Amino acid sequence: MFGGKGGLGNLMKQAQQMQEKMQKMQEEIAQLEVTGESGAGLVKVTINGAHNCRRVEIDPSLLEDDKEMLEDLVAAAFNDAARRIEETQKEKMASVSSGMQLPPGFKMPF
């Protein structure tokens, strides 16, 4: 079931190594900053890996337009940044599990 002699011990060792790699990767992701944009770059929102907003940049030309449009652009830029950070997290976490000999049908929780 676990690849013969020493298979279970080897699997446990791999699991521990993967856990250590995931811990390190989560710490790295928390430090990441990603910028999302909307309105062809007129609004930019920068968030970190914990989805905390770090910075909002608004082109001065938008300050003369209606408030509702500006609010929509800020929300869209934040959503773009959140999508980008999610993609980055998935890519980094997938790299942690590459090379591991997982049982058939086993899926990672990310």
UniProtKB/Swiss-Prot annotation:
Disulfide bonds: none
Region Disordered, annotated ranges: 89-110
Pfam families listed in its UniProt record: YbaB_DNA_bd (PF02575)
Molecular function GO terms recorded: DNA binding
GO terms for cellular component: bacterial nucleoid; cytosol
Coiled coil segments of this chain: none
Principal location listed in the UniProt entry: cytoplasm
Annotated keywords: Cytoplasm, DNA-binding
Compartments, record wording: Cytoplasm, Nucleoid
Summary of subunit composition and partner proteins: Homodimer.
Similarity field: Belongs to the YbaB/EbfC family.
Function: Binds to DNA and alters its conformation. May be involved in regulation of gene expression, nucleoid organization and DNA protection.
Protein name per Swiss-Prot or TrEMBL: Nucleoid-associated protein ESA_02800
Species of the source: Cronobacter sakazakii (strain ATCC BAA-894) (Enterobacter sakazakii)
